[in-house]
């Protein structure tokens, strides 16, 4: 699938556009129509989908009860959660670790269109590399907001810039 990046200055409306596309914010006008079999999945900067009282493994397992413990642990290991790390509670995790948990959940979801808002924020270099590997293996389409030039250059198949004048493709 394609890896489309949306870039632009702070405050140009990139996150708002994503939220409009996902019907999380009311649009002023127009119609949003996804393809017949499109299932979007969203990663937001705040990781608002996490239950802070869960452990890492329970957070992912609750979202994927059909998976075995081994499958869950393998998915978590791909995002650098190994050994006793999987038993940490979400409330004790750093911002980067919470981001990795959200990304694991999203990658295991049924979504075939990933919409990622600043997924490399708060991630250290090994975590960024794990994310890059996971996205490279992902077969669906990905739309990403990012200011991370290295990440964009490594992953992007298309780049659009949002500005007050509109959208420009590069």
Enumerate the predicted regions with their spans.
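ABC ATP-binding cassette signature C-motif
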Residues: 1-170
């Amino acid at each position: 699938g394609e890896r489309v990046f949306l870039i632009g200055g702070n405050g140009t409306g990139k996150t708002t556009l994503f939220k409009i596309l996902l019907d999380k914010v009311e649009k002023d006008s127009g119609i949003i129509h996804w393809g017949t079999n499109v299932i979007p999945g969203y990663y937001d900067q705040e990781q608002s989908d996490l239950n802070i009282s869960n452990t890492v493994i329970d957070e992912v397992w609750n979202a994927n009860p059909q998976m075995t413990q081994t499958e869950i642990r393998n998915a978590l290991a791909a995002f650098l959660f190994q050994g006793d790390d999987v038993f940490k509670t979400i409330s004790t995790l750093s911002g980067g670790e919470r981001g990795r948990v959200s990304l694991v959940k999203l990658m295991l979801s049924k979504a075939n269109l990933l919409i990622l808002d600043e997924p490399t924020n708060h991630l250290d270099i090994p975590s960024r590399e794990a994310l890059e590997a996971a996205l490279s293996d992902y077969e669906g389409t990905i739309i990403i907001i990012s200011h991370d030039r290295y990440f964009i250059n490594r992953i992007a198949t298309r780049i659009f810039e949002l500005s007050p004048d509109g959208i420009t493709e590069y």
